[in-house]
Amino acid sequence: MCGRYARTQGADDIFSAFDLQSNEVDHSLPLNWNIAPTNEIYIIRGQRSLATASWGLIAPWMSDIAAARASQSHAINARSESIHEKPTFRHAFRTSRCLIPATGYYEWATSLGKFAPKQPFYISRVDQRQLSIAGIWSSWQSEKGQVIQSAAIITREAVGELATIHSRMPVFMARTKWDEWLDPS
């Protein structure tokens, strides 16, 4: 499970790295080595447009803002194997996919591997270039009309050396698949 991640590149760097076409962001987010659930994050959606969302997908049936916010920390990750079935995630998976730019992510060792439990690891590319993590997003509206954009990271079974640390890992999206992923039609 990816419960924390880092984004050490700003909006301009993301714009360039992802060949973005438009910008929906009206303010810059600070660089952050410790992005936690419910923090505001950058997402790339639609025709490669930069937007912000709160990390943790708000379930569509939430009726008030307090319940919506409380539900977010339980929906930061969506399993790739069941995303199309789970009520919290299935609509967003069918209609609202995104990429989540990151520099790296943190994983805490479990008893699966050769490392002591709860030993943190920072996982990134050797060349420190951006990671593009597959995600989903949604737009939730309260009874009073407040709109909150939220997003979740898609995870899969860990492979290779990562499987010695934890059983899950984010789904990384190859550059050649970005447009196909962002257009679920």
Q: What are these regions, as identified by a protein language model?
A:
Residues 1-185:
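Short linear sequence motif anchored by a di-proline
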